[in-house]
Amino acid sequence: MVSYASIRQSSDEADSTVDASQKLDARKQDLNNFIQRHIGPSSADIQHMLDVLGFSSLDDLIEKTVPSTIRLHKKLQLPTAQTEYAALAKLKQIASKNQVFRSYIGMGYYDTITPPVIGRNILENPGWYTAYTPYQPEIAQGRLEALLNFQTMIIDLTGLEIANASLLDEATAAAEAMSMSYGVSKNKANAYFVSHDCHPQTIDVLQTRAKPLGIEIIIGDHQTFDFQKPIFGAVLQYPASDGTIYDYRAFIETAHAQGALVTVAADPLSLTLLTPPGEFGADIAVGSTQRFGIPLGFGGPHAAYFATKEEYKRQVPGRIVGVSKDVNGKTALRLALQTREQHIRREKATSNICTAQVLLAVMASMYAVYHGPEGLKQIAENIHQLTVTLAEGLKRLGYKISSEHFFDTLRVELGTNNLETILAGCQARNINLRIFDETAVGISLDETTTPEDLIDLWQIFAGEDNLPFTPEELISSLNLPLRSSSYLTHPVFNRYHSETELLRYLHRLETKDLSLTTSMIPLGSCTMKLNATSEMIPVTWEEFGRIHPFAPLTQTRGYQILFQQLEAWLAEITGFAGVALQPNAGSQGEYTGLLVIRQYHESRGETHRNVCLIPTSAHGTNPASAVMCGMKVVAVACDAGGNIDIDDLKAKAEKHSHELAALMVTYPSTHGVFEAGIQEICAVIHSHGGQVYMDGANMNAQVGICRPGDIGADVCHLNLHKTFCIPHGGGGPGMGPIGVASHLVRFLPGHPVLGSGKNPQNIGAVAAAPWGSASILVISWMYIAMMGADGLTQATKVAILNANYIAKRLETYYPVLYKGQNGLVAHECILDLRALKKSANIEIDDIAKRLIDYGFHAPTVSWPVTGTIMVEPTESESQAELDRFCDALIAIRQEIAAIEAGKMDTHNNLLKNAPHTIESLIVGEWLHPYSREQAAYPVSWTREYKFWPSVGRIDAAFGDRNFVCSCLPMEAYN
């Protein structure tokens, strides 16, 4: 401990002693300063990079990079930056205001037990949560295998033929099923039947999704629906929302006779006991895997599933993992059938889904791997046994159970008993039930329920009377239409049931993948920045994790404080009047923002406004989202500099002035520059009565420097999994909240269960839960709290510095395709590789795969311009890491030069044969005109640490021609 008395020699030195104390305190503060932990380059690094670029300061760089007309000339009004310790303490205080009740509300959400081996080694493991979507499959075989397990699990449980690798939530999955049914149904109907037994949130999301597409939603009883009104599809809940298990065969047969497709929203745990949807005729099955070990999290994130028949494989939304082979004939996995996705089909895509819920799908799959078929069945039987016992006790207490057949949920008719008395008993015991109405309540049990819990529940209904029975008297046999087919028979679900075995399996998979624990991931438009441990810790807190999304608001005051603060911070950062946190992915943020614009026009009697202008450089989700909102996409050209062609914009806006609804624009542009004409662009749209939707994918170059609302945007979505540090999770989770100008606030999303406090003119629900994937919002809260206004602004400046440093170092080797007015880029740069095809027969994939040999994930390839790579380093990477990456690309350029000079074969060379696996180096005859050393250790640092791909280059076409999306026999992996 420092003693200031030791340096206090006289009263004359008192002032200097105080100064020394202040300096020491400041130094101590600096050592705990999260900003320095988050931003990669040191002060010396920053100055060196500025010197290379010819600037004296970061402010000087920003002045030349960002147009002066849009720069923010004031400090963001945010709380002072806190240390990691202080921020965690503050958030813990907020979390303590949440009350963790035992929730038996059900409605698709259940308390569950996350096996500690899965929680510690997946959810809390950066090797899993910092990876990106597996677009480079050679360095993603681990999570691809885990996702193949997920798909196999869903295929087996549902009895259908194919499944995807997750969707955002059950309600969204049901909406995707409706859209797919609309697209493939052979009849011309535009009506869709929705059983009134579906969960309320699912019905609301379906209504939201249907309206702009002109689909009529018919809500009714499947038992009495007469099919006089032609329908193209239907959705049924299994078991029903009130717990009833129906036999849907007759309904499905009648629907099929009319040419309609039937979707069944099924609880996957119940399918370990119940007849699977595929066996009674369902065309599509959707649902949530939340109860497979995923915390409630006040609504998410959770992995939904989507299964269907193989004939619809090219219409399935989201990612599908497929089996293929590498160049050596070894079984390998990859994302299959990508040509059906939004980044390829754009406005012709049937879905805008991009980010989904990979991390949660991995957890759910491993829950099934760990428990196996017998373990899952035992969990389901225990839950059902307790439910049967609970029902028998309630009957003895004089209550009526509305259903004869049920799995885990009871609808209890109260008769002459008073609801308020029941609820008072619940409150006294910290219990939540579902309230159907004044006459009935619902009780849904889960794997955490114990016999002691049943006693508490019975006592609530017994009131002050003693229970006239004991639990032992009530045990009865299972009462279900049991499935006869087997499931989860693959060895992967029957091998890893000890913690030791599962731990090793998880580690083997993890080490096959390149994540941020390995090296920088320089993907343009993806912002793969640090996901700090201190930001991630609160996700695991029970106060956030064990809250049901429909718990009374009086029990979730901590969450409400979190939401209010985060909304206010994001509104200040974006310059908007209101923020909605419900959209649970960037794609859903786009969709929500456009729906808000659509609703705004409708409120003004301008329903004819349905044209959306979109630059040709836009991300594929933009046109896909616009079409989902019932808009007609009109493309706007870009000029030779990569900017929006303002003359073409003016012409298109003038031509479609009467119908103009919106412009979708990304800023900085998808070409990586701050377009000087952005304010004029916004003004043109407004002059024709349109609204400006700004895609916030590149917000990491704006925070603290400029704001969408000030620039002229009316709506902007934020990718919290980019700019605000939620990890990508290998392909999700994400969050896509939107900010809106004051005239649009009243249209922000609502919710049918908890409501939203918004104007009745709201667009309805866009996600199953009121605040989307609420539990991961703590990550962004922590990031902003620890960075403060100065830290956030500094991060933006350094992100721009890092990108310009890379562009400068590489421009003599690879042309930088687009630059701003002063020869600078924003937070990312596009390197033009197109000439290499002619000079050396080198494709962009060759460079991407060769980077793996150097230990790097490739930048974004062939987007937004074919034959280019887009590099985004973020602010979190040090100069040393930037130099390593640049050195790798420079070395690769020298390898290409050897081909150009005729020193290396144009087909058998280091790039064409990349990546090189250990097996390819040591097994068999070496038939290449370069050494094994050149292949494996091209630069010195690869000798210190080498990331080895587990497979060679994958044959993508083979996988699509021979489509398989479930686990192969184990011998196939040998």
Swiss-Prot record:
Summarizing the function annotation, the protein's role is: The glycine cleavage system catalyzes the degradation of glycine. The P protein binds the alpha-amino group of glycine through its pyridoxal phosphate cofactor; CO(2) is released and the remaining methylamine moiety is then transferred to the lipoamide cofactor of the H protein.
Q: Cite the record's note on assembly.
A: The glycine cleavage system is composed of four proteins: P, T, L and H.
Q: Which Gene3D superfamilies match?
A: Aspartate Aminotransferase, domain 1, Type I PLP-dependent aspartate aminotransferase-like (Major domain)
Ranges where the record places region Disordered? 1-20
Catalytic activity, reaction form: N(6)-[(R)-lipoyl]-L-lysyl-[glycine-cleavage complex H protein] + glycine + H(+) = N(6)-[(R)-S(8)-aminomethyldihydrolipoyl]-L-lysyl-[glycine-cleavage complex H protein] + CO2
Q: Name one GO molecular function term.
A: glycine binding
Q: Which GO terms describe its biological process?
A: glycine decarboxylation via glycine cleavage system
Among SUPFAM superfamilies, the record links this protein to:
PLP-dependent transferases
Give the protein's cofactors: pyridoxal 5'-phosphate
* This protein's name: Glycine dehydrogenase (decarboxylating)
Keyword hit for Oxidoreductase: yes
